[in-house]
From Swiss-Prot:
Organism superkingdom: Eukaryota
Alphabetical list of InterPro entries matching this protein: EngB_GTPase, G_ENGB_dom, GTP-bd, GTP-bd_ribosome_bio_YsxC, P-loop_NTPase
Protein name, per record: GTP-binding protein 8
Binding site residues for Mg(2+): 125, 149
Similarity remark: Belongs to the TRAFAC class TrmE-Era-EngA-EngB-Septin-like GTPase superfamily. EngB GTPase family.
All copies of domain EngB-type G, residue ranges: 110-283
CDD domains assigned to the protein according to its UniProt record, in alphabetical order: YihA_EngB
Molecular functions (GO terms): GTP binding; metal ion binding
Amino acid sequence: MAATRLWHRTGRLLEIASAFGPWPGVYSTSPAFAEVLRMPQKQLRKVVYPLRELEQHLVTDSRPGLIEQRLFDPSLEDIGRAESVFAATVRNRIEYLSSAVRLDHAPSLRQPEVCFIGRSNVGKSSLIKALFSMAPDVEVRISKKPGHTKKMNFFKVGKHFTLVDMPGYGYRAPEDFVDMVETYLKERNNLKRTFLLVDSVVGITKLDNIAIEMCEEFALPYVMILTKIDKSSKGYLLKQVLQIQEFVNTQTQGCFPQLFPISAVTYSGVHLLKCFIADITGSLK
Ligand code: GDP
């Protein structure tokens, strides 16, 4: 039934895509959504709905319902509409705004804000680049040199929202956090959602736990993104997803119960994440 609906919608969108030619503002660095819609059904499901794809491989007695928390399950039309929020055009300027080392240096903005946090090397820059792949002029700045000051980088996404790339936390995390990340998370008034990146190959580390505890302590609404899902076999990924899902279900209060598995290499899950961000920031009105 769901598959039929999916195919009905896909067929409809394909008609729309072919009627209008290439989608406006879509650049070649990411598979434009119209191209994704032309993929065979199995591949399309893997790219657009990675959790659904994983669910296919659940054996019936393996803790039913554990990854069935699909609270956010938009149609292909909705995902297609959200793409335009992330496509840079003259009327929808997507640009780097500024960097800050302290919250009082951060731009004062009214529009909703989302931030991305995660330990160094988790794949944060790669994900942000993937989100901005239809805004080729945006440079995602990376400052990885040891001793180089790490900053919060602010990006404006049209009139919709700002996206903040927070410094990655490493073994020197506590200092960075107290000075910057913690204050930002605690005091940023327009912060709508925090996206916490966890490496799906590694699982939740001690450093991730510090960030989770912080989000919990400040009662922030946050969302867990599982990165690099292209790196593991389906079996290993499923095991990791089930473990992390169980952790979220039993150990957290503020974490959105649905995980977002993504790959910045295959773009799997990236379109769905864009749609979620567009939705929670009210960009789809
Ligand atoms: P950051 O330190 O969190 O910003 O991490 P980066 O985005 O720089 O990524 C760290 C390393 O992981 C780089 O070598 C990336 O090429 C690699 N990487 C990032 N995302 C992915 C992914 O989705 N799949 C794979 N296979 N590698 C990734």
